[in-house]
């Protein structure tokens, strides 16, 4: 069974109804039908909380957390081992540390696919599966 790792950009595309939101919704639907699994790293979850809170939107962190729990999306802890691997991944591919946590999860298995709208992780693409969401249209 495929496991999709949503990074913060993918989840925010869904919340904000931006380019690629339909694909993220499809992935979550496959998860709820037990045809795929969806996970997110605790670090990426923290980014989502920070961004939503900073926007001052009507959508609260508690509501988003409730959605994750209701959908059964697992938040994977940032253990010391994962943090060390993410640091090395960040150095190897020259990607941001927080982004490296999603990449690190994708390296766990050949059945893992990172879903992102962040093209900064592109250097890791030759060594793992990454599904890039479309870029936002220019305004």
Located regions from the model:
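Alpha-helix capping/helix-boundary segments
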Residues: 10-11, 44, 82, 102, ...
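Short acidic, glycine/proline-enriched helix-loop-strand junctions
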Residues: 64-68, 72-79, 83-84, 122-139
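Active-site neighborhoods of divalent-metal-dependent phosphate/nucleic-acid chemistry enzymes
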Residues: 73-113, 117
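Acidic, PIN/NYN-like endoribonuclease modules and their adjacent C-terminal/linker elements
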Residues: 1-3, 103-139
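Short, well-structured N-terminal submotif of metal-dependent ribonuclease cores
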Residues: 1-40, 53-66, 138-139
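Short loop->beta-strand "edge-of-pocket" segments that line small-molecule binding or catalytic clefts
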Residues: 37-39, 71, 113
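Structured helix-beta-strand junction loops
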Residues: 34-35, 70-71, 92
